[in-house]
Regions:
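Domain-level signal for soluble alpha/beta catalytic cores
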Residues: 1-385
């Protein structure tokens, strides 16, 4: 943790996250933090850490035999998360100290971090409900628990606290939006002098843009890369002058270098609207490799186009400097522009020619399905089962 915090500080980042370390999974960490632990695991009578790993990996031993929680894909990534279970008897409350311990650990190093935690709405939407109660039945308890967490962070000296709400990029019902508003009206009422960042990613918030900008968040993080309508939403609806826009413009999911020209064009457009902008990654960098320093066997003609996690931090720092100057004559900008102007491996002329030659009839598959089905049945003669 010390290494990562120090790296980010030395790179020049203004907002350094904490509570992003996990023994196994951040969703599981959040569930445990709020006492969402199924009874079959607590009945084992194990230590807190062993109970955590029993939920993550299962347990077979003297205390009993239980399977791990189910696993699902984390939205549209190849990362998987543990699906927390909640039953009707679960008492949701702030039960853990790990996020506060890490904040204090970083503060002792002279680094005031921005604690990051999965938000109340996303947590409720990802839970597996095994009783009669549903998400709305837990709204008051969850809101109170998160409000308590926020108050504790502010008391500890946190300037910003980030709540990750990727579920907001899904298609939302009016009931979903009402639940989100109920949760955060309670949470934000307790923020005091602290500042709260609502962070979204993996898409745009077209179903709730007006709702989230109307709430008392101090910052809102939007994905300008996977969010197809993000730019349009900001242009059409504006952005509150009393909030900070954390613009996700450095891709947190792929390995490619950032096109500075395209990124700075968006930043310039936002600044022209007098929007207070902070340059951000589109999502967490856990989805990309760690650093290019370890890629000693790849030719430079490939690596010069790559940016892994460490390199993306450097891109953030470099783009921050460029955004505040007349960058079009800056050496870093010109080098980046030159790189993108001479990327021979990204264009295959033969493929371009084939695409250009596509005709309307090429989209019709022949023979028709019934004929293909008859041919396949005759050819393979597969049994019914």
């Amino acid at each position: 943790r010390k290494t990562q915090w120090t790296l980010q500080k030395n790179t020049g980042l203004d907002f350094i996250p904490s509570n992003d370390f996990s023994f196994y999974d951040m969703t599981l960490d959040t569930a445990v933090l709020f006492n969402i632990i199924p009874e079959r695991y607590t009945k084992l009578g194990l230590s807190a850490l062993d109970t955590y790993f029993a939920m993550a990996r299962g347990y077979q031993g003297a205390a009993g035999d239980v399977k791990a929680l189910a696993m699902k894909k984390w939205f549209n990534t190849n990362y998987h998360y543990m699906v927390p279970e909640i039953d009707d008897n679960t008492e949701i409350k702030l039960a853990g100290t790990n996020p506060f311990d890490e904040f204090a650990e970083a503060k002792a190093l002279g680094i005031t971090t921005k604690p990051v935690i999965i938000g109340a709405f996303t947590l409720l939407k990802l839970l597996r409900y095994v009783g009669k109660k549903q998400a709305t039945d837990y709204a008051d308890a969850v809101s109170a628990a998160y409000a308590g967490l926020l108050e504790k962070f502010v008391a500890a000296g946190a300037e910003w606290v980030q709540f990750d709400e990727p579920y907001l990029v899904h298609d939302l019902t009016s009931e979903d939006i009402a639940l989100f508003e109920t949760l955060y009206q309670g949470i934000l009422a307790k923020k005091g002098p602290g500042k709260v960042l609502l962070q979204t990613y993996f898409g745009d918030v077209r179903d709730c843009y007006g709702n989230i900008t109307a709430l008392a968040f101090d910052g809102i993080g939007l994905d300008f890369l996977e969010g197809r309508k993000t730019k349009e939403l900001v242009e059409a609806n504006g952005f509150p002058q009393d909030k900070v826009l954390f613009a996700g413009l450095v891709n947190g999911k792929n390995i490619w270098k950032n096109n500075y020209g395209k990124t700075l064009e968006v930043i310039d457009a936002l600044k022209a609207k007098n929007i207070n902008v902070v340059l951000n990654t589109s999502c967490s960098l856990l989805h990309v490799p760690y650093t290019l320093k370890n890629e000693t066997k790849l030719p430079e003609k490939y690596t010069e186009h790559f940016a892994f996690a460490e390199e993306k931090l450097q891109e953030l720092a470099e783009l921050k400097k460029l955004a505040d100057v007349d960058y079009k004559l800056d050496t870093a900008f010109l080098e980046n522009t030159s790189l993108f102007a001479t990327r021979p491996d990204c264009r295959n002329n033969a493929v371009q020619e084939r695409v250009a030659a596509i005709r309307e009839e090429d989209f019709t598959r022949l023979p028709v399905f019934k004929e293909r089905e008859a041919i396949q049945k005759k050819e393979f003669a597969l049994p019914v089962f």
